[in-house]
């Protein structure tokens, strides 16, 4: 398996549940405060066809005091990947396939996509794009939180993450990873 240095760096920094909580508090303020009991989950998964694959990072957590079980998938992309929604759906299906063997429900999955590539992000964060409102209630949806580092100023990153210096430097490093290449 070919692992890029920035993949290892990203996983090392963001494998800490406290940092995942901070990410949610910053980038998903509307639900961040309701999430607790974040725990890392094994990222090795098998599809129904017994194909093995690895997720970037995966955590279980609870929302408020309910028994609801949410898993959080973090993906980071250094380039625009038009197939990302398909990949997220595939990962979600594999997680549900495994979970339903032990639980009697399909837990919600929060997908977080880190983007620090060179181009503008132009993939909708809610898919499919449905123009007919009657059709909308019959259509499966995929939503994900996009953290587009190109759209966040260094000052905002510093002010939001100053309480965790490792996270601050990790995000700034990911944001500026291509700067020296361009210069």
Give, region by region, the residue ranges found by the protein language model.
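Elongated, amphipathic alpha-helical interaction scaffolds
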Residues: 1-183
């Amino acid at each position: 398996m070919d692992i890029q240095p920035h993949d290892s760096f990203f996983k090392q920094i963001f494998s800490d549940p406290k940092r995942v909580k901070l990410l949610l508090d910053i980038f998903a303020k509307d639900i961040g405060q309701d999430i607790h009991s974040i725990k890392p989950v094994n990222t090795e998964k098998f599809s129904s066809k017994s194909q093995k694959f690895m997720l970037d990072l995966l955590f279980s957590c609870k929302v408020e005091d309910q028994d609801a079980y949410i898993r959080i998938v973090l993906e980071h992309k250094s380039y625009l990947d038009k197939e990302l929604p398909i990949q997220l759906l595939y990962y979600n299906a594999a997680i549900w396939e495994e979970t339903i063997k032990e639980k009697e429900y399909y837990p919600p999955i929060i997908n977080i996509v880190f983007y620090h590539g060179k181009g503008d992000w132009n993939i909708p964060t809610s898919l499919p794009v449905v123009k007919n409102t009657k059709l909308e209630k019959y259509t499966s949806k995929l939503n994900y939180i996009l953290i587009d580092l190109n759209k966040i100023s260094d000052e905002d990153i510093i002010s939001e993450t100053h309480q965790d210096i490792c996270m601050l430097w990790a995000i700034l490093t990911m944001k500026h990873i291509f700067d020296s290449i361009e210069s």
